[in-house]
Regions:
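Conserved P-loop NTPase "ATPase switch" module shared by AAA+ and STAND
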Residues: 64-85
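Phosphate-binding P-loop
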Residues: 12-17
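N-terminal pre-Walker A segment at the start of P-loop NTPase domains
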Residues: 1-11
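Post-Walker A helix-loop "phosphate-sensing" segment adjacent to the P-loop in P-loop NTPases
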Residues: 39-50
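Walker A (P-loop) phosphate-binding loop of P-loop NTPases
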Residues: 26-30
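Hydrophobic anchor at the beta1->P-loop junction of P-loop NTPases
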Residues: 22
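Post-Walker A alpha-helix
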Residues: 33-35
Length: 128
């Protein structure tokens, strides 16, 4: 479970530590969640986000898959940059933080994960 309730758009994640994958339906709030996580991370909150653009810029994903530093990690478009090394790191980190995964295509990898669902309103995003 993780919540950030002090900002104008609240984030509430009703999940235990582990890897959770969103379905690939468009316009549900996943991109907004990613944007808010990046914004709140800049405010010093224990959240992080990583996307294909970060990968292309050469940013090291190990900086965000750090459960000692982050309670919630959002991995956007993971299917575009995942490899065995990244998936292994995700598996290790998932014991100590919540990792939410968005893919543009079906998520077909050999790691343990569950599905998650997002509900967005004007003032809140809830993931369960």
């Amino acid at each position: 479970m993780f919540s950030l309730l002090k900002y104008s758009v609240k984030i509430n994640v009703n999940l235990d530590n582990g890897v959770y994958v969103f379905d690939n339906e468009s316009a549900t709030g996943k991109s907004r969640l990613y944007s808010l996580v990046k914004k709140y991370s800049a405010y010093g909150e224990p959240v992080a986000g990583y996307t294909f653009e970060d990968f292309c810029r050469g940013l090291d994903i190990t900086a965000v898959l750090n459960p000692k530093k982050f309670a919630l990690v959002v991995l956007d478009r993971l299917d575009m940059y995942s490899n065995r090394s990244i998936l292994s790191l995700i598996e290790k980190s998932a014991h100590d933080c919540i990792i939410l995964v968005d893919c543009k295509n079906d998520f077909q990898v050999n790691i343990d994960y569950d599905w998650c669902y997002i509900n967005m309103t004007a003032n809140a995003i809830e993931v369960s």
